[in-house]
């Protein structure tokens, strides 16, 4: 999808405030919902994915199962709200051995397991909003001893709220981020009595 796009800096694949946040995504819902709601903490529109079973409610990008993202930027960043329920996401990458590998992170696992085509790992989320930064190049090298070439697919499962999902060429400090990539928490004005 993005193979022939010049890639540097930031490449966003989901923004909850956009007119069609799931334009390039496919949705699967069983015993749950995927809807846009206003989050009270940030007073802004977010995408909520909830389901009784994490494996049957998710969004996947690209929507067409025969297509791939072709994103070469090595950092995946997701701004996600912890709903204090089971949550998992999966990224499929291509390495320099031309092998498709999957990384699955979840908040209900306690150990990392590396198998030839999938690496599952635990993820700890703080209360409220989290910025998940995933160094795909580093994970590919550490898990498989190969070099990351590109990301083919991203799949985000229940249960979470999403503000934005993007790729970047490196990790950026809060000061370096463009305004629309930051998560603004409303300032609490407490007048002194």
From Swiss-Prot:
Entry keyword set: Cell projection, Cilium, Cytoplasm, Cytoskeleton, Flagellum, Microtubule, Nucleus
Domain of life: Eukaryota
Gene Ontology BP, a term: regulation of cilium beat frequency involved in ciliary motility
Name of one Pfam family that matches: CFA20_dom
Subcellular location: Nucleus; Cytoplasm, Cytoskeleton, Microtubule organizing center, Centrosome, Centriole; Cytoplasm, Cytoskeleton, Cilium basal body; Cytoplasm, Cytoskeleton, Cilium axoneme
Principal subcellular localisation of the protein: nucleus
Entry GO CC: axonemal B tubule inner sheath; axonemal microtubule; centriole; ciliary basal body; cilium; motile cilium; nucleoplasm; sperm flagellum
Annotated tissue distribution: Expressed in trachea multiciliated cells.
Stated family: Belongs to the CFAP20 family.
Quaternary context: Microtubule inner protein component of sperm flagellar doublet microtubules.
Described function: Cilium- and flagellum-specific protein that plays a role in axonemal structure organization and motility. Microtubule inner protein (MIP) part of the dynein-decorated doublet microtubules (DMTs) in cilia axoneme, which is required for motile cilia beating. Involved in the regulation of the size and morphology of cilia. Required for axonemal microtubules polyglutamylation.
Protein name: Cilia- and flagella-associated protein 20
Organism: Bos taurus
Gene label: CFAP20
């Amino acid at each position: 999808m993005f193979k022939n796009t010049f890639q540097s800096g930031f490449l966003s694949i989901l923004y909850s405030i956009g007119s069609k946040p799931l334009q390039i995504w496919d949705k699967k819902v069983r015993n749950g919902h995927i809807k846009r709601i206003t989050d009270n903490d940030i007073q802004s529109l977010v995408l909520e994915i909830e389901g009784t079973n994490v494996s049957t409610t998710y969004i996947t990008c690209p929507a067409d199962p025969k297509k791939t993202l072709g994103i070469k930027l090595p950092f995946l960043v997701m701004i996600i709200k912890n709903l204090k329920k089971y949550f998992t996401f999966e990224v499929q990458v291509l390495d320099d051995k031309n092998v498709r590998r999957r990384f699955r992170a979840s908040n209900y696992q306690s150990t990392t397991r590396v198998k030839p085509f999938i690496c599952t790992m635990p993820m700890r989320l703080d209360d409220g909003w989290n910025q998940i930064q995933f160094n795909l190049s580093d994970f590919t090298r550490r898990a498989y001893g190969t070099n990351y070439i590109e990301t083919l697919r991203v799949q985000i499962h229940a249960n979470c709220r999403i503000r934005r999902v993007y790729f970047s060429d490196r990790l950026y400090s809060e000061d370096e981020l463009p305004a629309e990539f930051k998560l603004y928490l409303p300032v609490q004005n407490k007048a002194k009595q």
